[in-house]
Swiss-Prot record:
One of its GO terms (biological process) is mRNA 5'-splice site recognition. It is found in: Nucleus. Keywords: mRNA processing, mRNA splicing, Nucleus. This is Serine/arginine-rich splicing factor 12. It comes from Mus musculus (Mouse).
Length: 266
């Protein structure tokens, strides 16, 4: 606008016209007046700009100023700080003031009030949901443990009832699950049983009779008899087989009772 008005002023001066405001046409004067009016109208509006209000609205809990404040906020506003510098228009003083007072009151007042007023229902629902999940988990684990206990007790009772039946069924050559290292059939388990018999006799000295010292070579010879009977001498075979059969019948009863007690111990 200044460059245009300057050009017009130069023209008017060169043409010998009177002073500038009188020489300016109505159109140019109206444009200048409009520009000045716009600038004058824009100056008081600057403090009233929507930016601070938008900032206050953008923050949660600072919605429409301290004019509609509740009880604790009004109590805080009753003790004002230093007055804020007034803007060009008197009415525009209110929007920045509540924000400042709010920031001050948040520090001055007890923070528990605001914490309480923020979201107690949310907090309650959160705690409820978490405790509900915990209870649910706890009940599930309880059910699982009960189920485990019941299944364990059932299996225990089954294992207790099994050996009684198996004592009668063990004479048949069906392999048993809990027979362990005593072999699947009698013909295979003869050498193993003789070894276990030797161990038991060496452990318990009160069971050893007068022939206890001779029991070890007899056992070894019996192993060789079971593996290759033609190599061993005849005298040993007749006496050894007799002693072995008697000892084995005795040992079978012992091993059965031992396995029965061992299974029932746990």
């Amino acid at each position: 606008m200044r460059s245009f008005s300057g050009a017009v002023w130069e023209r008017q001066v060169s043409l010998g016209a009177p002073s500038w405001p009188a020489a300016m046409g109505d159109r140019i004067y109206s444009l200048e007046a409009r520009a000045v009016a716009r600038s004058v109208l824009a100056r008081p509006r600057r403090p009233r700009a929507p930016r601070p209000r938008l900032r206050l609205r953008g923050r949660p809990g600072r919605g429409r100023g301290g004019l509609l404040g509740a009880g604790p906020r009004e109590a805080c506003l009753a003790t004002p700080g230093p007055p804020t510098p007034p803007c060009s228009s008197g009415t525009s003083q209110t929007p920045p003031a509540p924000g400042q007072m709010k920031s001050k009151e948040r520090h001055l007042c007890s923070p528990s009030d605001h914490r309480r007023s923020r979201s107690p229902s949310q907090r309650r629902s959160r705690s409820r949901s978490s405790s509900w999940g915990r209870d649910r988990r706890h009940s599930d684990s309880l059910k699982e443990s009960r189920h485990r206990r019941s299944s364990y007790s059932q299996s225990k009772s089954r294992s207790k009832s099994l050996p009684r039946q198996s004592t009668s069924l063990r004479q048949s050559r069906t392999p048993r699950r809990n027979s362990g290292s005593r072999g699947r059939s009698r013909s295979k388990s003869l050498p193993k049983r003789s070894k276990s018999m030797e161990k038991s006799q060496s452990r318990s000295p009160q069971k050893q009779t007068g022939s206890g010292a001779k029991s070890r070579p007899h056992g070894r010879h019996c192993d060789s008899i079971a593996r290759s009977p033609c190599k061993s001498p005849r005298a040993y075979t007749s006496s050894g087989s007799k002693t072995q059969t008697t000892k084995h019948s005795h040992l079978r009863s012992h091993s059965r009772s031992r396995s029965y007690h061992h299974k029932n111990s746990w």
